[in-house]
Amino acid sequence: MHEAPRGFLEGEALRPRPFRAGLGHLGWIFAGGALGAAARLAVEGAARRLAPAAYEAFPWGTLAANAAGSFLIAIFGTLIFERFVGERARAFWVLGFLGSLTTFSSYALHTLRGWEASPLLGGLYGGGSLLLGLLAALAGLRLTRRLL
């Protein structure tokens, strides 16, 4: 079992350890990416089924996937910086699964499409996504520190 560095549980900043991804990690990244992409598709599909009219007007499925991914990546990021999670888990969860679940390109595209339809809608989505993502990441970080 790994121990947390001194000061971490009190909220001190940590220096991230470098990720040494190599060809041996590709399988883990691919597997995580496949599951992350499937999870994103499931979230988008659920959003479309639950409220088709709202889904067409506002990309809340993407918003939900990105917020959930921000929360989870903060948890895994905290664990990784603590060295509780090994390189394979980092490749699978962070680069693969969460990298596929959350995509900046989808965020940018939805923000631009919203802006074209209505600058207010585009601004709300773009700003709201950024704020919600940061708040979700902060919640994940604090929850992880509290539980450790």
Curated annotation (Swiss-Prot):
Transmembrane segments: 23-43, 61-81, 92-112, 120-140
Topology in the lipid bilayer: Multi-pass membrane protein
Reaction(s) this enzyme catalyzes, per UniProt: fluoride(in) = fluoride(out)
One Gene Ontology cellular component: plasma membrane
Main subcellular location of this protein, as a coarse class: membrane
Sites where the protein binds Na(+): 99, 102
Notes on activation and inhibition: Na(+) is not transported, but it plays an essential structural role and its presence is essential for fluoride channel function.
Any Pfam family matching the protein: CRCB
Record's protein name: Fluoride-specific ion channel FluC 2
Natural source organism: Rubrobacter xylanophilus (strain DSM 9941 / JCM 11954 / NBRC 16129 / PRD-1)
Source organism phylogeny: Bacteria, Bacillati, Actinomycetota, Rubrobacteria, Rubrobacterales
